[in-house]
């Protein structure tokens, strides 16, 4: 996937299937968008759309060290950073940044590594805030037939009658209470 794309030249042709699944809804008067690592870029379009719809957007971004997309997020959001090494913003995680800055929201949207998503899911449950998370898995078929991208769910699905959700078809965005991560 990504490696093949990186070797492409202008004019090269590809076949692609997509987009797959669903995306984030653009709701909330005071939404918080949270991105960690490679989960940061997917949140930029959402932050811009939310701002355009009149929302007061807060972005909490988690990095190892080097910051990116700061100006782009700043044009649509109040931006708070967390870095593992303390290079900028809060030293620690996005959860640390949320607590340190006493941030609140009426809805949370998040994309990033699973440990971060687990912590955000827990925080949202404690604060009783709806939370939508974007999960990532390799998607072999992209249409939900192969079940390679399933995650555990609270309810049985109609497709296989087990507690699974297909990330490519039922997601990748889920209400955090629907899935186990």
Q: Model-derived features: where do they sit?
A:
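N-terminal start-of-chain detector that recognizes signal peptides
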Residues: 3-7, 30-31, 51-52, 80-83, ...
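Reductase modules of NAD(P)H-dependent flavoproteins
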Residues: 60-181
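FAD-binding FR-type
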Residues: 1-31
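Short capping/connector residues at structural and topological boundaries
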Residues: 10, 25, 29, 45, ...
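Hydrophobic, well-structured mid-protein blocks that either form specific transmembrane helices
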Residues: 22-79
């Amino acid at each position: 996937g990504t490696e093949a794309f990186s070797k492409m030249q202008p004019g090269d042709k590809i076949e692609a299937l997509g987009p797959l699944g669903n995306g984030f809804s653009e709701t909330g008067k005071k939404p918080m968008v949270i991105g960690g690592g490679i989960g940061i870029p997917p949140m930029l379009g959402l932050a811009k759309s939310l701002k355009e719809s009149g929302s007061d957007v807060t972005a909490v971004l988690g990095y190892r060290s080097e910051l990116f997309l700061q100006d782009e997020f700043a044009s649509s959001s109040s931006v708070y950073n967390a870095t593992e090494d303390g290079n900028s913003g809060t030293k620690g995680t996005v959860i640390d940044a949320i607590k340190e800055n006493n941030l609140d929201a009426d809805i949370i949207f998040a994309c990033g590594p699973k440990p971060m998503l687990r912590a955000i899911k827990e925080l949202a449950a404690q604060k009783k805030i709806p939370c939508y998370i974007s999960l990532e898995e390799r998607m072999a078929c992209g249409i939900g037939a192969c079940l390679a991208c399933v995650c555990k769910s609270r309810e049985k699905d109609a497709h296989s009658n087990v507690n699974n959700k297909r990330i490519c078809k039922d997601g990748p965005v889920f209400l955090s209470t629907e899935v186990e991560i």
